[in-house]
Curated annotation (Swiss-Prot):
Species whose genome carries this gene: Borrelia hermsii (strain HS1 / DAH)
Pfam families: SpoVG
Superkingdom of this protein's organism: Bacteria
A GO biological-process term: sporulation resulting in formation of a cellular spore
UniProt cross-references to HAMAP family, sorted A to Z: SpoVG (MF_00819)
Name of encoding gene: spoVG
Keywords assigned by UniProt, alphabetized: Cell cycle, Cell division, Septation
PANTHER family: SEPTATION PROTEIN SPOVG-RELATED (PTHR38429:SF1)
Protein name in the entry: Putative septation protein SpoVG
Family per similarity comment: Belongs to the SpoVG family.
Job of this protein: Could be involved in septation.
SUPFAM superfamilies assigned: SpoVG-like
Length: 96
């Protein structure tokens, strides 16, 4: 499965404590779209969070997620490459 498009929606937070940097939409093989991947700045660097929902008991469950580390790295790399391309001032992006 090839990543054929990555679209970044940067979040301009007025709250200085906010860790959310962007929402991402990824297209696979020009036939499947995955919305609402989040780019987050954490204590150990920047990482992606897959789309999830909150259960009745307050836990968060992924709606979709990579099942192996190799694909997660491919996906994360494509997202970060596009993020830096669209936000050249973010070259200090530290991957967590």
């Amino acid at each position: 499965m090839n990543i054929t498009d990555v679209r970044i929606r940067r979040v301009d937070n007025k709250n200085p404590g906010s860790k959310l940097l962007a929402y991402v939409t990824v297209t696979f093989d020009d036939c499947l779209v995955l919305h609402n991947i989040r780019v987050i700045r954490g204590q150990k660097g920047v990482f992606i969070v897959m789309p999830n929902r909150r259960t009745k008991v307050g836990e968060y469950k992924d709606i979709v997620h990579p099942i192996n580390q190799s694909f997660r790295e491919i996906l994360q790399s494509a997202i970060f490459k596009e993020y830096v391309k669209e936000n050249p001032s973010s070259l200090e992006l530290e991957i967590g």
